Every structure is written in C-alpha cells, then in structure tokens.
Amino acid sequence: MSEKITLSGVPETMLQTVYARAKETKTRGAITDNKAVEIIDRLDYDFSMADKDAAMHSGVIARTIVLDKLVKTYLAGHGGAVVENIACGLDTRCYCMKGYSHWYNLDLPETIAVREKLLPESGNISQIA
C-alpha cells in the first residue's frame, strides 16, 4: 500500500529526515532504523531533493547517533522514565529504546496527523498535537 503525503514548509522536513535515516540503514549502515525503512517503503513521495542534499543527510545521521546514545544512556540510569519527544516529526526512536514507562510524541497538528497514519499510537506510545 502506498501512502500519498502532501506537505510543505516545516512539516515537510520530517519526510527528509526519515528518508535520510532509511537511506543510511539501507546503504552505509552507520545507524539502523528499520522503522524508517518501513515508512519510506510505504510512501508515495518524490525524495529526489533529499538525495541531492548530502550535508542534510550527514547532519541527520550525526544527530541520530548522538541522540540515540544520550537517550539510551539516560533510560539505562532512570528505569521507567516518561519521555516527552518534542517536535518529534517521524522520529522512530520510541520503537527501539527500552526502559521507559511511557513515550509522548509531541508536534504540530499536521505532523501528528501524518504520524497517526504511518505510526499509530500503541501501548505506551502516545501522540499529542
């Protein structure tokens, strides 16, 4: 099934970041984000501009590596923490981290609407617009 997504402005940037994580997972493998790959495989969207922006790709991957390490370290020392992921976009960290009691993804209403299509709430993961 292919999901047609039409966004512009700030909300559109979330598609570029999830694409960078999926592409990295499929190619060089500095990170592994299989949920991002699942999302990209479902979308009907032209990612040609994201393919041309190597600096953006590198920045997304560097930020992902740093944030994954910080969140993992924090959760290891604070079992059962509640996580508030502000400006979450299509971040998929909640699906690979362990040790939290509840994860809240917060963003603009149009972003959360896309999240609800592609990454619906489940169990201890909630979305707030």
Question: What label would you give each PLM region?
Answer:
Residues M1-I128:
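Rossmann-like AdoMet
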